[in-house]
Structures are given as C-alpha cells and as structure tokens.
C-alpha cells in the first residue's frame, strides 16, 4: 500500500521588506486646512526560493494630497512572507500564492501604513479590505487573453 503524501501549507516568516514615508511639504503642510484625497495602490508578487519555499510580497502605496495638488505624504510598505508549500498541485499552489498568502499579509501591511502615517503626525489611514481573489481572477483572465 502506498503512503499518500499530505499537503503542507505553512507560514515560515512574516517581515517588512520595505517601508518608506515622505512628507515633502513639511512642516508647512501641517498648517494647511482641508480634507485630503487619499489614493491607494496595491500590488502582489511571488517567487520561488527553493524546493517548497516561496516568498510573497504585498506592496501598498498610499498618497494623500490636498486640493489634488500638494502631497501631504507618500507611504509605501512591502509586507512579505515566506511560505512553505509541499505536495500541493501547481494550480492550487498558484491560488494559494495569489490569494491566500496576500490575504494573510495585507492586515500587517495595513497596520504598518496606519502606524507610520500616525507617527508622522497625520490622522490614521484606515485601508479597506481587498478582494485578492477578484484580482487573481482578473490576472488569470488577462494572461489567458494574452496567450
């Protein structure tokens, strides 16, 4: 009787790969009034490190501007994780790397953005949850259309 190998999915390490904050118009920007317009961009990526180990990145860039002109701040965070995937079919592994891992990492990135912006003297930025499954499906459709 053959021994069936059990699938393995585990978090090996979570870490901040990159964190930057720019306040180009400080200190004058703190004296200005108005509601900032906040723009958020998110990207994900993964790479194979060695057999069974993958690095996944979630990069969040938040820009706040007054009157759609003067930048209050620009904050970029790359939250990363090393994940172990073994005995998992390639299609399922792609889904884990493109959806499950970013879902695990995003709350850490969101906290890093909020904490950094607050420590810079601005009100906290509360980022809404992201549907990484929808993003993954769009990427799959775009790749299929381009093939």
From Swiss-Prot:
One cellular-component annotation, GO: cytoplasm
Keywords, sorted A to Z: Chaperone, Cytoplasm, Protein transport, Translocation, Transport
InterPro entries in UniProt: SecB (IPR003708), SecB-like_sf (IPR035958)
GO biological process: protein folding; protein tetramerization; protein transport
Signal peptide: none
Major site of localization recorded for this protein: cytoplasm
MF GO annotations: unfolded protein binding
Location within or outside the cell: Cytoplasm
Keyword Cell cycle on entry: no
Entries under NCBIfam families matching the protein: PRK05751.1-5, secB
Assembly and oligomerization: Homotetramer, a dimer of dimers. One homotetramer interacts with 1 SecA dimer.
Family, per entry: Belongs to the SecB family.
Protein's job: One of the proteins required for the normal export of preproteins out of the cell cytoplasm. It is a molecular chaperone that binds to a subset of precursor proteins, maintaining them in a translocation-competent state. It also specifically binds to its receptor SecA.
Stated name of the protein: Protein-export protein SecB
Originating organism: Neisseria meningitidis serogroup A / serotype 4A (strain DSM 15465 / Z2491)
Gene: secB
């Amino acid at each position: 009787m053959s021994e069936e190998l059990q699938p393995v999915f585990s978090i090996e390490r979570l870490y901040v790969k990159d964190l930057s904050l720019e306040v180009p118009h400080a200190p004058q920007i703190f004296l200005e009034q108005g509601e900032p317009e906040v723009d958020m961009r998110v990207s994900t990526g993964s790479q194979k490190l060695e057999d069974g180990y993958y690095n996944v990145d979630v990069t969040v860039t938040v820009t706040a501007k007054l009157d759609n002109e003067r930048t209050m701040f620009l904050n970029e965070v790359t939250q990363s994780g090393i994940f172990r995937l073994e005995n998992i079919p390639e299609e399922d592994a792609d889904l884990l790397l493109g959806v499950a891992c970013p879902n695990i990492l995003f709350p850490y990135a969101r906290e890093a953005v909020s904490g950094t912006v607050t420590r810079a003297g601005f009100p906290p930025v509360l980022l809404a949850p992201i549907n990484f499954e929808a993003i993954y499906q769009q990427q799959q459709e775009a790749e299929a259309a381009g093939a």
